[in-house]
Amino acid sequence: MDPLVLSLVVVVMLGALAPVVGSLQVALAGIHGLRNHLRRSGACLPRTVVVVPAWNEAAVIGASVDRLLAMDYPADRLRVLVVDDCSTDATPDAVLERVVRHPGRVIHLRTSEGGRGKAHALNEGLARALADEWAEAVLIIDADVQFEDGTLRRMTRHLADPRVGAVTGYIKEGSHDPGFLNRFIAWEYLDAQAAARRTQDVLGGLACLAGGAQLHSRANLEALGGRIDTSTLAEDTVTTFETQLAGRRAVFEPAAVVWAEEPPDLHALWKQRIRWGRGNVQVTRRYLSTWFRPWTRRGLSGVLFGLSWFTVLLQPLFMIASAVALLVLLAIRDDVAWVVFRAVWLTHGVCYLFLVLSAFVIDRQVATRCWREGVLFPGLVSVVIIGYAAVQAVTGAWGVSGGHPVAWLLAGWLASCMAVAWLAMRLETARGGRWWSRALLYLAGYGSFLCVVTLAAYVRELRGSDNRWEKTEKRGRALLAS
């Protein structure tokens, strides 16, 4: 085969890398039942301070504090410290009401200077918590989350092993009236947390302690200087990496379930995920000396961990490169183009089928509620293309002529789907645009939306945009079950 054609074939196949790596993650997650930290855990109920950063959280903070105090955990071993970041709504009133109702168990701390972001508020709370020798562990949560009974106990049991520095739980989308977007997010979390973090546990390296539920031993926080990094938009991930690079384990506890309210519309989700995406780019640069060095340490430096991280981070570029290469192939060797096209999309189809079926094993509750969003995660157009490729494989028929407009549409879809997903977000606030926005998202796929967000995060980082914290508005929609 001509070297140019061979090179183009290799680039086209990059378009199938993400579902292949995702399927490998899910397959490895099955080992978690046999290879996990439970055998080293034990009865452990440390005196725990729950640090809750809050800025204008009047709609949710009261219910969250009440739920924390009602948890199945010894009352004399649990305190709640709400760090009020100079809220301008009724947040202080809601907290102070509970300070009076639960003297000694609820503490209200108003920051010295508001509006600097979550990490700065957390640092003031951590300084207060660690100044008192009473605290043996610190639980950092978001103001809107709701803990299931037994969740904290399931997390603290891992601290019986002194090698463990931090534990995170399984965050579930918990809106009591979930719309189609919330169901997509619920499905995403099933894959990104319930599956991926199990795999990371097996590999010995955790990518991120969930901001809504991360438990630290006092020793771990003190080893980190008693502070959270404020120079990045991914302070949770930096804390996770620093914990493990310092020699302590970070553990995922899938049975520690926490329900959270997620953005109800694409614009709010865009702001949240831009922050996450930029944070991941910052983390990637910060830890360049860590990636793909399995001879130095397992876990974060492992090949599989790095492959998973960079597949997600670079997926938009892989999709664009794959589409462009396929279009070039279509122009110069349409016979080869159709063979590679079929290979890419059949790989997508087999992997997505495996992922959807596996979801019912990993979390039947979420999978049963959101299976339609799971099937349509890659988008309706992609599902149709997978079917078209399957028909080609069965019948042996080639595609339409290389000069036909449909051929160019099929070849370029891996890239153009991101443009359609971006348009769905832009139309959401237009007059009469919400229906079109929803229709376009179903056509392009929620996965395509996540990719275009990552692409936008690249651009903002290249421009050197400010690390401004874009707060996600909470409306008190989270319940313990959904």
Each language-model region and where it sits:
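Acidic helix N-cap motif at the loop->helix transition within catalytic regions
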Residues: G62, D89-R98, K118, G150
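Cell-envelope/extracellular polymer assembly enzymes that use nucleotide-activated donors
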Residues: P46-V49, R79, V238
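A conserved acidic beta->alpha catalytic loop
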Residues: A75, D84-D93, S112-G115
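The conserved acidic donor/metal-binding loop of glycosyltransferases
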Residues: D142-Q146
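N-terminal membrane-anchoring/stem segments of glycan-assembly enzymes
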Residues: M1-C44, A424-E428, Y442, Y446-R463
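Short, acidic, metal-binding catalytic loop of nucleotide-sugar glycosyltransferases
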Residues: D66-R77
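Membrane-embedded multi-pass helical conduit in multi-pass membrane proteins
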Residues: R40-G42, T311-E461
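Long helical/loop segments within the catalytic core of UDP-sugar-dependent glycosyltransferases
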Residues: P103, R110, G117-E136, D149-L233, ...
